Amino acid sequence: MSTMIDIRRLQTVNELAREGASTVAENMSQLTGVETQMQITKINVIDVEDLGAHLGAAKQVGVSVPLKEQPYGSVLVLFDDESARRVAGTMMGGIESEGGGYSDMERSAIREVGNIMTSGFIDGWANVLGRTIDISTPQLIRASGEDIASHCVDPGEHEIAMVFDAELHAPDANVEAKIYSFPDIEAFVSMINSI
């Protein structure tokens, strides 16, 4: 099977990102009762082997979610520490973080937002692709980028990572996140080329 995307289909990747962002914003607005917008500011494709260097040594917090259906693989939503604390504070009704380690409530809030972002993003993809994409239970992660890369992604199983730089805007909090998609490349290309 070919792993080449028809150049005329690249617009579909942008459409996936836009629809995913729109669905995330709707879901966040419904959950929090606060008008939320999400914008994808940049899309990149990187080699999975370069992921550790891309993520760097700084600790990051996020959620990893395996996909049970095409395009398979997994989705990873990562926040830097400052953004993760803002997310947790917003979800907990403005309660300020005490710094240091994350409380159980903060971890739960971050897991919930990561789950909302992942499921919303994937639901947006499903809408564009005209199918369902079932996901597994989200796993909370807090580690250096290099450790995340080595524990969450198998370079032998995945060749590329699609990186979506995202900004969430709400009246009291602006948050930056990165959404990494590690699809089964053959399944992903087949889906894109079949539209």
Curated annotation (Swiss-Prot):
Effect of inactivating the gene: Deletion causes a reduction in chemo- and phototactic ability. Mutant has a 88:12 distribution of forward and reverse swimming (distribution is 50:50 for the wild-type).
Keyword Iron-sulfur annotated: no
Gene Ontology MF term list: hydrolase activity
Lineage: superkingdom: Archaea
Pfam short name (any one): CheC
Any one of the GO BP annotations: chemotaxis
Alphabetical UniProt keywords: Chemotaxis, Hydrolase
Stated family: Belongs to the CheC family.
Function recorded in the entry: Catalyzes the dephosphorylation of CheY-P.
Protein name, per record: Putative CheY-P phosphatase CheC1
Species in which this protein is naturally found: Halobacterium salinarum (strain ATCC 29341 / DSM 671 / R1)
Lineage, opening ranks: Archaea, Methanobacteriati, Methanobacteriota, Stenosarchaea group, Halobacteria
Protein encoded by which gene: cheC1
